[in-house]
Amino acid sequence: MGNIMDGKSVEELSSTECHQWYKKFMTECPSGQLTLYEFRQFFGLKNLSPWASQYVEQMFETFDFNKDGYIDFMEYVAALSLVLKGKVEQKLRWYFKLYDVDGNGCIDRDELLTIIRAIRAINPCSDSTMTAEEFTDTVFSKIDVNGDGELSLEEFMEGVQKDQMLLDTLTRSLDLTRIVRRLQNGEQDEEGASGRETEAAEADG
C-alpha cells in the first residue's frame, strides 16, 4: 500500500509547528520513543474494554510506520500531519490500514465489525443511529463490488468517496480531535491519574 502519507513529510510543516511538536513530544517522552503503554497513558486511555484496547493498539500500530514497536518523533509528526492536514484520500488510506487488523490488504466483516465496536466503546459520542452490525452490513452491501465478503483498498477508497453517508459516518467515528487537542495543548489527565494508572497496571498485569 505504500506510505500512507503519500509523500507528506515534515518539510510541509512550518518550522514553528515542528518546534512546538518536538518540544511537546520530548517533554512527554524524553527517550524519544513512545511505547504503547505511554501512548495509552498520555491520551488518558485507561480501563478500556477489550474492544477499545484492541482499537488503541491497532491505531498505535498504524502510526508505527517502521514497525519497531515505538512511535518516534518523525512518526509522531507524520501522524499529526495526516490528521491535521491530510486530504480525504490520505485519511481513507489510513482508515483502511486501521481496519485491516491482520494486515493482509483486505478488510473482512469481522475486522470491520471489531473496529466499529471498539470505536464506539472508546468514543460513545460517535454516530449510533445504526448498530455496529447494521453499519457493517451497510458498508459491505454498498461497496463490496465483487461480493467476495472482503473489501480491497480500491473498493474501500472508491466506494466510500462515492457515498457521502459512509464518508460522513467514518469521519465522525474516527474523529481524532481529542487526541490532537491533547498533543497541541500538552494537556494531561491529572485528576485521579495516579489511581487510574494503578488500576490500569493491575488490569494489564
UniProtKB/Swiss-Prot annotation:
A lipid is attached at G2 (N-myristoyl glycine). GO terms for molecular function: calcium ion binding; calcium sensitive guanylate cyclase activator activity; guanylate cyclase regulator activity. It is a lipid-anchor. Ca(2+) 1 binds at D64, N66, D68, Y70, E75. The keyword Membrane applies. GO terms for biological process: cellular response to calcium ion; phototransduction; positive regulation of guanylate cyclase activity; regulation of guanylate cyclase activity; regulation of signal transduction; visual perception. Ca(2+) 3 binds at D144, N146, D148, E150, E155. It is found in: Membrane; Photoreceptor inner segment; Cell projection, Cilium, Photoreceptor outer segment. Residues 14-49, 51-86, 87-122, 131-166 form the EF-hand domain. It holds the Pfam family EF-hand_1. The modification Deamidated asparagine is found at N3. SMART domains: EFh. Ca(2+) 2 binds at D100, D102, N104, C106, E111. Residues 185-205 are annotated as: Disordered. Keywords: Calcium, Cell projection, Lipoprotein, Membrane, Metal-binding, Myristate, Repeat, Sensory transduction, Vision. Detected in the retina. Detected in rod and cone photoreceptor cells (at protein level). Also present in certain pinealocytes. One of its GO terms (cellular component) is photoreceptor inner segment. Binds three calcium ions (via EF-hands 2, 3 and 4) when calcium levels are high. Binds Mg(2+) when calcium levels are low. Stimulates retinal guanylyl cyclase when free calcium ions concentration is low and inhibits guanylyl cyclase when free calcium ions concentration is elevated. This Ca(2+)-sensitive regulation of retinal guanylyl cyclase is a key event in recovery of the dark state of rod photoreceptors following light exposure. May be involved in cone photoreceptor light response and recovery of response in bright light. Homodimer. This is Guanylyl cyclase-activating protein 1. The lineage of its organism: Eukaryota, Metazoa, Chordata, Craniata, Vertebrata.
